[in-house]
A protein has these predicted regions:
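Terminal intrinsically disordered, low-complexity extensions flanking WD-repeat/beta-propeller proteins
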Residues: 43-46, 54-55, 65-66, 75-78, ...
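A near-ubiquitous, low-amplitude feature marking generic local secondary-structure context
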Residues: 2, 11, 41, 51, ...
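Acidic, glycine-rich loop-and-beta core segments that form the ion-binding/anion-interacting portion
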Residues: 1-36
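Blade-edge beta-strand/turn elements of extracellular beta-propeller
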Residues: 1, 34-50, 95-97
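Canonical WD40 repeat/beta-propeller blade segments in eukaryotic WD-repeat proteins
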Residues: 4-17, 53-60, 105-112
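Residue-level detector of conserved, well-ordered beta-strand and adjacent loop positions
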Residues: 20, 49, 69, 101
Length: 158
C-alpha cells in the first residue's frame, strides 16, 4: 500500500472501511478498503501533506468520521477534516483545519478524549538536557466545526 517506512496506522471506528497511515515521507494516507484492485493492492484516496518531518502518530476523532489528527517529528499536530476536500480535486489543503504548534520537540503520542468534545492530550520529546518530555492538554476551538451562520449568531451577542 505505502512505499515509505510506515510509522503508524489507525482504523476509522465509524467508517470502518477507512484506514489512515502515517510514514517517513511526511504524508498521511487515507485508504478505502473497498477500493482494492484485483490483486489486493490499494491506492490512497487522499494524501494529506502538512508536516515537514515523518509522521509519528495519528488517530481518527471518535465523534466525527471525517476528522483525524496527525503528530510528527516537526513538533506539530495537524487536525484534518477530509469532508472538506472537493471530490473532483487532488488538492487536499482544505482538509487542514487546525494546527497545534505548542510543542518544542517531536510529538510522540496523543489521544483524543472520547467524552470531552475536541479535547486532546499530547506528548512530546522536548529533547532537553535533563531528558524526558511534556504532556499538554488542549482543545480545538469548537468554532472550527460550527456552521458559519451559527458562529456569526454567537459572535453578534458580543
Amino acid at each position: 500500500m505505502q512505499c515509505q517506512d510506515v510509522h503508524c496506522v489507525d482504523w476509522n471506528a465509524i467508517d470502518t472501511h477507512l484506514l489512515a497511515t502515517g510514514s517517513a515521507d511526511h504524508a498521511v494516507n487515507i485508504w478505502d478498503m473497498r477500493k482494492l484492485d484485483k490483486s489486493g493492492k490499494a491506492t490512497p484516496v487522499y494524501v494529506l501533506e502538512g508536516h515537514t518531518n515523518g509522521i509519528t502518530s495519528l488517530q481518527w476523532y471518535p465523534g466525527q468520521s471525517s476528522v483525524l489528527a496527525s503528530g510528527a517529528s516537526d513538533s506539530l499536530i495537524n487536525v484534518w477534516d477530509i469532508s472538506r476536500i472537493q471530490s473532483d480535486s487532488n488538492d487536499t489543503t482544505a482538509a487542514l483545519v487546525f494546527q497545534h504548534s505548542g510543542h518544542r520537540g517531536e510529538v510522540t503520542d496523543f489521544q483524543w478524549n472520547a467524552t470531552e468534545k475536541w479535547t486532546m492530550l499530547s506528548v512530546s520529546d522536548e529533547s532537553q538536557p535533563s531528558g524526558g518530555g511534556t504532556v499538554q492538554a488542549w482543545r480545538v476551538n469548537d468554532m472550527v466545526y460550527t456552521d458559519e451562520e451559527k458562529v456569526l449568531q454567537e459572535l453578534q451577542q458580543y
